A protein has these predicted regions:
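A short, hydrophobic C-terminal helix/tail in secreted or cell-surface proteins
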Residues: 197-201
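N-terminal assembly/interaction segments in proteins that build large macromolecular machines
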Residues: 2-196
């Protein structure tokens, strides 16, 4: 059957798949969008399975807080090109938003969250099939405190910090502390008095 450009474009917006993949899926599904989406999903799963033994050493790392609950998450891929892709970064952000909203404590909980027409894990697998690269959620940590602050360095997708305080802290000061930690990468924080006492013996 003939497939219109409007339908192809619509399916592409729904799935993120390439134009030709969308056209072929719609043709095979005889114009049924649900069936076409399932065809694209299965193709993505097959592509992801073939790449399961590859190394995913690049990716996107982002952090977010609700005030007393903060999360940092990493979605990994194979190349920096994909890591910098807007759709890949958006997927990471969307997963992070879901994890924070549901206050997930483990990565398994995150992967099982509903997302789109499936789960978070399904969405990652689908994106893997679209890009042709191995992708995996590989890092996840939560921090809780009376007050937490996060810092995403220049909104880039690699350098983030989370700082938790045992009482309310002025937001500007908290951000400055988080930025200094990102810049200096300290192994610990001690008071000036303690440091001077250690230096003088």
């Amino acid at each position: 059957m003939a497939v219109s450009m409007a339908d192809i474009t619509k399916l592409r917006k729904m799935t993120g798949a390439g134009m030709m993949d969308c056209k072929n899926a719609l043709t095979e599904a005889e114009g049924d969008f649900d069936k076409a989406m399932e065809i694209i999903r299965k193709k993505g799963q097959a592509v992801a399975a073939k790449r399961s033994d590859r190394e995913a050493s690049e990716g996107c790392v982002l952090a977010k807080t609700t005030g007393d609950f903060a999360v940092i998450i990493a979605l990994k891929c194979e190349t920096d090109f994909v890591a910098q892709n807007a759709d890949f970064v958006k997927l990471t952000q969307d997963i992070l938003d879901l994890a924070v909203a549901n206050k997930c404590k483990t990565l398994d909980e995150v992967k099982a969250l509903p997302m789109g027409n499936g789960t978070v894990q399904d969405a990652v697998t689908d994106r893997s099939g679209i890009t042709g690269e191995k992708m995996e959620l590989d890092g996840y940590m939560t921090v809780e405190g009376a007050s937490t602050v996060v810092y995403n360095h220049m909104n880039r997708n690699g350098l983030c910090t989370i700082v938790a305080f045992n009482k309310a802290v002025e937001e500007g000061l908290a951000k400055q502390i988080a930025m200094q930690i990102a810049a200096m990468n300290p192994i610990a924080a001690v008071s000036y008095t303690h440091l001077r006492a250690h230096e003088t013996g």
